[in-house]
């Protein structure tokens, strides 16, 4: 059985599907990733320093200047979900219980209509005042070079997990992954902890859960998966959907 037919069969057999997505999920929407030759790490110096909790506290004015520049494309909005995002919504329409565990901060899974999305690294869509808790949307953030709380004038903080910060919903993600019949990892290099521990956790806690990786390139964790498909997400899921519909 070829890989596409195998994955289609496993999806049909699964009732509960957990999907771990990374930056490669959104590149087909025109959003750059972090680690490719054209990604953020190649375009900017010291990314992990300037996007850290430490630097936000040290120099919040320069932090925002750099943050807005690094994420200018995302901050402008206008990006649309791609075939990969829509495929996950389609799985829900098939009657599957789908939980998306995303490392992305672009909000495209929700835009595509997925109903159960755990944004592990937060979202670009909002920022919060660390002093009084007031929350502000993207239009407010973009109107101000350095966004300050209207109530107390504190410089607000983006609702993304900065380097050195805690990932607040990890326990929920581990539980959802272990409770699934099928774990799909899509468009992720599996380089970032603690998210990259999810396949290990599933293997230990739920050995019957099938684990599948779809990615353009090999990762250091390929050996953790029952099935690895190398290729673009859009093309791969189109083939899988066609196979499911044909059977």
Swiss-Prot record:
Positions in coiled-coil regions: none
Disulphide-bonded residues: none
A Pfam family assignment: SIR2
HAMAP family in the record: Sirtuin_ClassU
Binding site for nicotinamide: 34, 105-106
Record keyword Cytoplasm present: yes
Top-rank taxon, per record: Bacteria
Annotated active site: 121 (proton acceptor)
Record localization: Cytoplasm
Cofactor note (record): Binds 1 zinc ion per subunit.
Cofactor(s) needed: Zn(2+)
Binding site for NAD(+): 23, 27, 34-35, 103, 105-106, 121, 188-189, 215, 233
Keyword terms of this UniProt record: Cytoplasm, Metal-binding, NAD, Transferase, Zinc
Main location: cytoplasm
SUPFAM superfamilies linked to this entry: DHS-like NAD/FAD-binding domain
GO MF annotation terms: histone deacetylase activity, NAD-dependent; NAD+ binding; zinc ion binding
Domain Deacetylase sirtuin-type: 1-247
Keyword tRNA-binding included in the entry's annotation: no
Entry similarity comment: Belongs to the sirtuin family. Class U subfamily.
Name this protein carries in UniProt: NAD-dependent protein deacetylase 2
EC number of the protein: 2.3.1.286
Annotated Zn(2+) binding sites: 129, 132, 149, 152
Cellular component, GO, one term: cytoplasm
Substrates-to-products reaction catalysed: N(6)-acetyl-L-lysyl-[protein] + NAD(+) + H2O = 2''-O-acetyl-ADP-D-ribose + nicotinamide + L-lysyl-[protein]
